[in-house]
Amino acid sequence: MKKKIIITGGLGYIGTELCKLYSGISWHHKIIVIDNRFLSERVNQIQNWNMEFIQGDILDKKLIERHCADADVVHHLAGVTNVPRTKSESSITHDEKIKKVGETGTQNILDVISNKCKIIFPSTHVVYEGINEVKNNIREDEKTKPVLSYSSSKALNEDQLKKSGKNYIILRLGSVYGYSTDSMRTDIMPNLFSKIASQNGTLKLFAGGRQIKSLVPLIDVARCFKFMEEKNEINSEIFNLTKDTVSVKEVSEICKKHNPKIILKETNDEIPNLGFSLSNKKLLNTGFEFLYNLDQNIKEMIEKWSSQNIKKDLEYVKDGEKLFKDERGTISNHELTEPINLIGLINSKKGTIRANHYHPQQEQKCLFTRGQIIEVFQDIINPNSPKVTQVVNEGQLSVIKPNV
């Protein structure tokens, strides 16, 4: 059955990986990605996967209603992720933003989706951050104890979903770790430690690294969202989505195993609590299986970051960009990894309209050296495919797929 699937926050850390998973079946379903940001390379990739991208905010209820009213599934990932981790980092303005986006945005979606729509929502393990003593294997029915604005907002979101009468799945995520080529987060402990380890740095272990952490691999999180979408028999449930329960010191020792050059330094700095862990028994009973582990993810992150070029401090150097401009002029670089079998020039007058012929097998790439054009694409094999419109500016590369 063809489904209409909405992914809010689809350009984020988890959303990017979820879109990759859906890329293999996007020709069979209508998939719409909504995000309040516009990141051109990611948007272009989403459109190449035959997904529709909408730049919009979940606080815009009319926009949400227009796209979600007839949805079969909503993966509701949108929200503020730059959040305070201690009371000293909090501010009234930022706390209000977290509350408004999290609560009003979620309610907007709940108000407009139908009763047949399944909404899958990421909560967080930090809804238990107020627990003072070390507690292991916390189950889903344990009463939450939020403290800061982020966890309080997530706990309220859980109540919104449970009281909505809609078909919901709540996944309480552990700290999500893992390398992403598109949307990397280095504010998560395993990712931060791996980044430092890749540069032969020093890992500081507050309170001797005794704090317990509940962790979960990024790609397994995306897999679990898709798993819950596909399982029609799983409805109105909460699951703890965690895999690894480890101490901070154990994570640092894995980093040192993969790079013996790093230094581990234990300190007596205070920490809010010694941590807690969540039980994933209920989730595993559904048949979901984890495919990734902490050791292999840390190894991958260290290796990928270690292989990055380090800038030489000889003179002003700027690398890693396709286009560079300053008062001296413009430099653009575009890597073409495939063989080129035809090369030519297009020169058009301002204000004219031209129809480009299609290539049944080959991909056409056009580098614009001057001016600006508006392109409209459609897949001619699939008459119901969406029309894609994009603006191409000077120095940008236009890619025309086969049969388009």
Cite the ranges covered by each PLM segment.
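Glycine- and acidic-residue-biased ligand/ion/polar-headgroup-sensing regions
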Residues: 361-381
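NAD(P)-dependent short-chain dehydrogenase/reductase
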Residues: 159-213, 218-222, 226-227, 255-256
